[in-house]
Amino acid sequence: MRVEYFEDTDTLQITFKEGTVVDTRDLDENTLVEMDADGQLVAITIEHAQERTDLESFLYKKHRGAAA
């Protein structure tokens, strides 16, 4: 998984897995969902990210432990 922010275009891209994108769907006018040939999610692209997300406080926590 990879999260990238492109400051010059104010675009946030979250890539969930590597793969060839064969279908891109508009979730709304500023959000694209990219799918592979099996219909699995590859990435989400968010335009105008600064006004639509809280980029300044973005962080994640990785949890490790026994599966429930």
Predicted regions mapped to residue ranges:
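Small, basic N-terminal interaction modules of short regulatory proteins
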Residues: 1-68
